């Protein structure tokens, strides 16, 4: 049995899905097995979505990634990478002029980004730690309740 569940809340999706597809303006930015999407989040948009997972403690520092810039119209998508107008890791002309390639990691994750995979891994190592911490904090809160 399969079903389509659409949400910006990747934490909820983690309980429901074995495979996650992250879309931006209707285009696939990242997809793969759920655990691969989370550990670490490779695409900058996935990283931003995961950073927005609320913490049970309202006083805790969240480290949210704020996406700046205007959200483009899906009817008039920007050239190049659809996420380039809001990407916190914007590289310049290559992002504006060229569609990003799809790259596949050893664990089956597919990412559309101009940043080379080895650099994405390096950039995301801190994100992965933050996401694991955030998710384990929420899981421990649920157990305590």
Predicted region positions:
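A short, surface-exposed alpha-helical micro-motif characterized by mixed small hydrophobic
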Residues: 13-15
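H-loop/switch region of ABC-family ATPase nucleotide-binding domains
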Residues: 7-8
């Amino acid at each position: 049995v399969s079903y389509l569940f659409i949400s910006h809340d990747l934490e909820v999706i983690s309980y429901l899905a074995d495979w996650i597809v992250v879309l931006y303006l209707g285009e696939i930015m990242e997809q793969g097995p759920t655990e691969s999407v989370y550990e670490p989040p490779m695409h900058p948009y996935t990283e931003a979505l995961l950073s927005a997972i609320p913490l049970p403690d309202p006083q805790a520092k969240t480290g949210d990634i704020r996406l700046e810039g205007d959200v483009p119209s899906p009817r008039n998508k920007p050239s190049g990478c659809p996420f380039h107008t809001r990407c916190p890791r914007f590289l310049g002309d290559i992002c504006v002029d060229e569609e990003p390639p799809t790259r596949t990691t050893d664990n089956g994750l597919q990412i559309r980004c101009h940043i080379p995979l080895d650099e994405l891994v390096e950039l995301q190592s801190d994100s992965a730690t933050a996401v694991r911490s955030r998710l384990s904090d929420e899981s421990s809160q649920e157990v305590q309740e």
